[in-house]
Swiss-Prot record:
This is Probable D-serine dehydratase. Keywords: Lyase, Pyridoxal phosphate. PROSITE patterns: DEHYDRATASE_SER_THR (PS00165). It comes from Bacillus cereus (strain B4264). It is an enzyme of class 4 (lyase). NCBIfam families: D_Ser_am_lyase (TIGR02035), PRK02991.1 (NF002823).
Amino acid sequence: MKEIGALQAEYPLVNKLIATEEVFWINPHIEKYERAIKDSPLNEENVKDAEERLKRFAPYIAKVFPETKGTNGIIESPLVKISSMKEALETTYKQPISGELLLKCDSHLPISGSIKARGGIYEVLKYAEQLALQHGMLTEEDDYSILDSDTCREFFAKHSIAVGSTGNLGLSIGIMSANLGFNVTVHMSADAKEWKKDLLRSKGVNVIEYEDDYSKAVEEGRRQADADPSCYFVDDENSHDLFLGYAVAASRLQKQLEELEVVVDKDHPLFVYLPCGVGGGPGGVAFGLKLLYKDNVHCFFAEPTHSPCMLLGLMTGLHDKIAVQDIGIDNVTDADGLAVGRPSGFVGKTMEPFLSGNYTVSDEELYRLLKELADTENIYLEPSALAGMIGPVKVCKEDEYLQKQQLTEKVKKGTHIVWGTGGSMVPKDVMNEYYRKGLELTV
């Protein structure tokens, strides 16, 4: 890897990253959709396959998780207009936001209350299906609710699943795996919140805690799983299945936009702002959206100033060969879901030609935005889930991207979607504490 001095000379923005200042980065490697998709390791067929699998599992999900009965076992979240929050943002940052502002409430996804309910649950279901098909317990034509039986649970109990997580991925994989009957172990990094560990233990999940950061928890989890032939490791850094589970969100969002009569075409651009940790969740969602809307959707990743791993990897082209700690950043943030020092190389390389840009936001800003959203819309998110909220302000303020893409006028007829990644499962006392911090920082 290059010396820090060489990186600073070649990429002046590195200096601001080191100083943990907020930055806005436009991706110089973005390509037109038709060109980018040609070299992509994944395609529309892969996403459709994931979508079909989730439909097959819908009867099982509806039976085992009553909260999904209303959607017939499809795990989906609301898309809501947040006009009052938009006004508050414009007033606070003295910056008009051209276009409509919507919030995708993955914070309120059933089962595990975060975006990770998409990829995490999907990968566990895919593995369960594979085992059940191999052992003649299921055919693809069956009603999958038959998996909710003592026989199936006893069968799955002979197998184990492991994952490394800062919290939310562990919740979705732990809850789903335990329900099916698997023995499940979640390796949790130092920044994982106590309530998330407690919730997992209450579901019968084995939680192993580490004093190190996320990368160490994943590494240990992978090592222990490798030593056990009956253990399946969900690899958050490299998993195509997780990525595809997230990508399914796009076609669901498309239907919701149509219901709200929101048009997306070359004259009505769509901007999407996604909090980013290791990259799988935002990468998968953005990839799915690109497949549908091609050059008419513009996706931005949002990271904490103390954990800008994806921005660093993309900007330098080093991807997972560089960690924020290599340039002296501590990777300590209250945005626990985004506290990742080294990005996924698979996601970075896959998304490089599709991603519009990346920006960072301070913890203090996240708390202020948390309070503002609660006050204006009565929606409570966890700190990491607010990273996308400042995106529309940044894109409209730093209008270089809009100019480059010839969107300065079109943005007025466009739509901004902030992806709210988690929060509904946060205990009330913890959420009150978050709100109090936001209040202190606002006064």
